[in-house]
Amino acid sequence: MKRQIAFLVGFAVLAFIAVVIAPAPAAAQTAPTKPLTIESLYQPGGLGGRGPETVEWSPDGTKLTFVQRDERGEKGELWYADAATGEKKVLVSAAKLAALDPDVNKVKNEREKERLTRYHVAAYLWAPDSKHLIFDSQGQLWLYDLGSETAVQFTSAPDPSGDPKFSPDGGHLAYIRKHNLYVRPVSGKTEKQLTHDTGDSLFNGDIDWVYAEELAVRSNYFWSPDSKEIVFLHMDETNVPVYPITDWMPTHPSVDNEKYPKVGDPNPVVKLGVVDADKGKVRWISLTTDAETYVPRFGWVADGVIWAEVMNRTEDKLDLYFVDAKSGKSRIVLTENTPGAWIDFDHVEARFLKNGKFLWPSWRDGNMHLYLYSFDRSNPMAADAKLETQLTKGDFEVLSIEGADEAAGTVFFSANKDDPRQTHIFSVQLDGSGMKALSSEEGEHFANFSDDGKHYTHMFFGPQNAASISLCAVGGACTPVWQARNEIADYGLRAPKYLEFKADDGTVLYGRLLLPPDGTASGKIPLIINIYGGPAAQMVTKGVPNAFDEILARKGFAIFAVDNRGTPGRDRKFQTAIRHEFGAVELKDQLTALDQLLAQYPQLDGSRVAIWGWSNGGSMTLYAMTHSDRFTAGVAVAPVTDQLNYDTIYTERYMGLLKDDKAGYEQSDVTKSAEKLHGALLLVHGTSDDNVHFQNSIQMIDALIKAGKQFRLMIYPNKTHSISGKDARIHLFTMIEDHFERELK
């Protein structure tokens, strides 16, 4: 149930999220030059124009490459910006790229399209020599020679090949086909199959749904530094239950059975293997006797030594193992415990440096900070890892490690220092000194550093200017790479008022309010609350203006959002306030903030308040409408209605195991409170949602009917969790707007 924003792929998708969902920054009101409508949000390129896709650095750090398509996405070129000069040139022409990297919108299968965009699957990969590229052209791999400007089809099997990886010496390419590992010499034609399992339940180096969605796993195999071996994760999903996803459009509907572990179900059984890339012999590694564990991250410390993170099922303990790849012997070198909380897995990932040290993010002092550990590089198995120093300190959250310049002893990271509603780029020395900001303008800043840490791409969503991407030298100048159209000026997007409230325990809650344009409101103003409310997303950040909020405001509504306890971006105490109890704390904070808002703004009509949200926001909408009488109307899009319907990793992380807290699960089940529904409900779901299953809404429909409650329903055939596509999105947001017009006026 995560909302994920990645820098490397799909800037156009990110820009859409910012325009439609993310909150607005402080900016001066401007007179619009273009009409703002729901249809305009989905014009080719959106409001700001189609941005670069698959932004990558060449391994030698000399080129920043990206795919730039026309507004419709039908034609594109692979460009590069020279790191030294900033000069931009075409690297692969449109005629050649059309076959090598087709537009993702041409993918017909909605679930595959969502996988490619949601999980940011890169369309091309640099070779270590920075002279070749491998393209994944909808399952067939092509090797492109930059010198001769020619492409050779590398795979041609009937089944698709994916997740390609060059060996560090550049001599071989590994890839996944039908859940098995393959390898082939770059200069040869003989393909070797390294693993030989059959069926759809055994994975070797491939990724299942729940690891991809909830542990952000994007690859499950890695080459050894000497290019001789590959470590991979074997996943056995034999005992994982299936969920049927039905395609209703053919005369005879078809069913795809998705492996999906729900709360209390068996998880995939996993183990690490090491395979010889030449001989294909596999050695299995034993890490723990506990079968109820996750192995979400692993890699190579050095030749012959593997690292692996192992987390227990309750997700409050994580062990870092070092493993002798030859003997399979392992030892725990570091343990992270979070009693009374959970492992904040979006951030806790070891990053190994070349000097026998590694970076380790931890919540241990109450905030997410960076710690530097060392080990004996000549004999990594000899002793536990040694804590050298805490690199960052203070009342803020480190959000991500972005890169490192090991020669200069510098680490780069993003954090929300001074304001949890902003994201900035920082650097700090490996001795913990000299922390400084690399960005300063109010807003959201994201970075992608070259391997040597000398240059970075800087993506900026600011309050006064359109979104942009620049190429920057560390400590030097930045050169523009791409600039969005100025949607703020063109469409007259306005900033909200940024507000602060106090929860019952005194905790500061951040909110935002957008009122109708001056002089357009007559009488009391109806209020719409846009909610997410869960552990995966903030609603109140200082990014680009929210266009849908502006559309609603021009219809005479006020739009409000507040980040309750349990949302990210704050300290451990704030985030874990919802542990073992979804709904109650969140709603309490929302209502407390609402009362304070109504007291501050008497022009708002407290008798006409609506609420709406998507995913967890849809769940919270249903919870609010069945556990209070404050809401006149609501829209719940793709909601979880019973936490037992959602996956193990996400739900058990926050709610605990079912056997330990049945009462907590029962109180969060909104189907059990259907008879208490207050207000006019619009319930929305896509039938092919493989994340939050359509089953959730079916159960809610049944409960509401039995309770004698009337409601509106919209089902989107074959649409996934994002309900994507121009036609579906225009229909959906028009229906949401219409629902509020009907019920609040």
Regions found by a protein language model. Give the residues of each.
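Positively charged n-region of N-terminal signal peptides that target proteins for export
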Residues: 1-4, 745
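Polar/charged alpha-helical tracts
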Residues: 2-3, 31, 84, 99, ...
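Generic alpha-helix initiation/capping and coil-helix boundary signal
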Residues: 5-11, 157, 504, 617, ...
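Serine-hydrolase catalytic core recognition
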Residues: 241-242, 297-299, 304, 309-311, ...
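Sequence-pattern detector for short linear motifs
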Residues: 5-6, 53, 712, 732
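Beta-propeller folds
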Residues: 7, 11-13, 21-449, 454-456, ...
